[in-house]
């Protein structure tokens, strides 16, 4: 099978290219840019590609659909919206790592992304690809955001089984620097980040509406969540610590059983039998590791969800959705063990 990848210079695109190269069902990858009108050698993009013979072609929707079975967009928000319409019109398979088609409501996109949205008709063609909560997929798959993935996997059993007070959910999320993207800013500068923690986008993170959209599909009583994001001085990884009041007295064993029942058929979701996960448990893999606890003194359920933001939170989940769409083995081309030490 031949596949197309638009965007190989950002962190998610780099990881996705590596995963696609080692996928057993993929014979060839065609790379495309979205700026410029000339073909460039991949090896000129970064030193890591010096042995690569691939080239990056100018974007050409017609050529992509003619020569490939599917296209992956590893492009920034606002870019994919401008490129995707020919594929939507042709019902050509797309997996989109940007946030441009995750939200069903164009007004919500305008509010949270501060950009012009795709049309409501175009947005309606996309399905939200939370790969470990299988649902029917359309030809246009909107890959979830990294924070959204970690948070939703941590909340799904609580929401679907209505175990918590729906207005009591608090999420404290922490991410490594690669989640901020490749372009350096004052906030991501080494001097600002090293030996430091910094809260950002308090109650304003653009992944909030996609989380709410999915949570309300599971349980309409969830009207809002408190969600904070903190930048931490590590390269990769997301840890979300979730707090919610239980609807009735429980035990940790009962809470863990709810999670095990939800994920027992999902090879990439690990519910720990004891203790809490760390970033080292997942970085380099496509796994989500979950730890749970119940505090009877405060009647609070605590869930810790950890993922690699560039794998499960981006490229790995994109490949997982690719496997689902074409009915390949769910683990094909994906690492199930973390990189340790």
UniProtKB/Swiss-Prot annotation:
Primary localisation category: cytoplasm
Active site (UniProt): 146
Highest taxon listed in the record's lineage: Bacteria
Associated pathway: Amino-acid biosynthesis; L-arginine biosynthesis; N(2)-acetyl-L-ornithine from L-glutamate: step 3/4
Subcellular location(s) per record: Cytoplasm
EC number, as in UniProt: 1.2.1.38
GO annotation, cellular component aspect: cytoplasm
Cross-referenced InterPro entries: AGPR_AS, AGPR_type-1, NAD(P)-bd_dom_sf, NAGSA_dehydrogenase, Semialdehyde_DH_NAD-bd
Reactions it catalyzes: N-acetyl-L-glutamate 5-semialdehyde + phosphate + NADP(+) = N-acetyl-L-glutamyl 5-phosphate + NADPH + H(+)
Molecular function in Gene Ontology: N-acetyl-gamma-glutamyl-phosphate reductase activity; NAD binding; NADP+ binding
Biological processes, Gene Ontology terms: L-arginine biosynthetic process
Alphabetical keyword list: Amino-acid biosynthesis, Arginine biosynthesis, Cytoplasm, NADP, Oxidoreductase
NCBIfam families tied to this protein: argC
PANTHER family assigned: N-ACETYL-GAMMA-GLUTAMYL-PHOSPHATE REDUCTASE, CHLOROPLASTIC-RELATED (PTHR32338:SF10), N-ACETYL-GAMMA-GLUTAMYL-PHOSPHATE REDUCTASE, CHLOROPLASTIC-RELATED-RELATED (PTHR32338)
HAMAP family: ArgC_type1 (MF_00150)
UniProt record similarity statement: Belongs to the NAGSA dehydrogenase family. Type 1 subfamily.
Function: Catalyzes the NADPH-dependent reduction of N-acetyl-5-glutamyl phosphate to yield N-acetyl-L-glutamate 5-semialdehyde.
Protein name in UniProt: N-acetyl-gamma-glutamyl-phosphate reductase 2
Native source species: Lactiplantibacillus plantarum (strain ATCC BAA-793 / NCIMB 8826 / WCFS1) (Lactobacillus plantarum)
Source species taxonomy: Bacteria, Bacillati, Bacillota, Bacilli, Lactobacillales
